[in-house]
């Protein structure tokens, strides 16, 4: 992978928009919006300067297209409609006791949030439950052929990507997400708490509460029975 010199961002963006205008589409996905320095002695650019240049180009792109950005930093938030690859777990350093969805609570309602690929997680079922707990939409990264064809290539990180192997899991995950989060994607999160051992509750600004149970048995909490390894949604006004 080669990095484009920050000083070339403007020219590259203008050329891209000119060519891209020929394609009838309303959205654009940006793989990377990283900031970095350029130590060219004839045109040195610092990271803060790169950030300013990048924001100017994102503003141009956002005027023409809806933007999906992968793991964007705070400097991209104002221009992002969809963010993909959003982390849903902590580093698990020794001093970390719990994982808190701080980013999701800040951004939910202002943009759509998608997880990192569920099929590449160590436990796909837990990853789907965590996505729903955090109000995110599940993402899968699949290939038409079996992932074994990628052996000895530059794409060995897609170690479990064969679509036919994941088809039923994908349908089940999207069905669960739709039932649990329909109508909530545009709502802000007002509270996230642990309601019981391995049971978490996320409250949205419309009053709905989504309970996620990671236990292998049903749990009754706040007067509701949350199914094992499942979800219960308390709709605003329901008892």
Question: Where in the sequence are the language-model features?
Answer:
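Active-site-proximal substrate-binding groove within the catalytic cores of carbohydrate-active enzymes
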Residues: 1-239
């Amino acid at each position: 992978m080669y990095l484009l010199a920050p000083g070339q961002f403007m020219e590259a963006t203008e050329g891209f928009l000119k060519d891209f205008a020929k394609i009838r589409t309303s959205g654009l996905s940006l793989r990377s919006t990283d900031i970095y320095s350029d130590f060219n002695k004839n045109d040195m650019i610092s990271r803060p300067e790169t950030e300013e240049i990048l924001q100017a180009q994102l503003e141009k792109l956002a005027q023409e297209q809806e933007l999906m950005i992968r793991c964007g930093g705070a400097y991209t938030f104002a221009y992002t409609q969809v963010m993909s690859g959003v982390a849903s777990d902590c580093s698990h350093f020794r001093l970390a006791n719990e994982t808190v969805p701080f980013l999701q609570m800040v951004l939910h309602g202002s943009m759509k949030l998608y997880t990192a690929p569920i099929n590449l997680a160590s436990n796909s079922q837990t990853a789907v439950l965590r996505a729903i707990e955090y109000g995110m939409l599940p993402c899968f990264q699949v290939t038409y052929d079996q992932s074994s064809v990628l052996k000895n290539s530059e794409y060995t990180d897609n170690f479990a990507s064969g679509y036919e192997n994941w088809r039923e899991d994908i349908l089940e995950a999207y069905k669960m997400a739709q039932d649990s989060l329909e109508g909530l994607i545009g709502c802000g999160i007002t509270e996230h708490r642990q309601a019981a051992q391995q049971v978490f509750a996320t409250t949205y600004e419309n009053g709905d509460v989504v309970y996620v149970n990671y236990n292998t048995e049903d749990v009754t909490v706040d007067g509701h029975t949350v199914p094992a390894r499942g979800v219960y949604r308390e709709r605003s006004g329901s008892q």
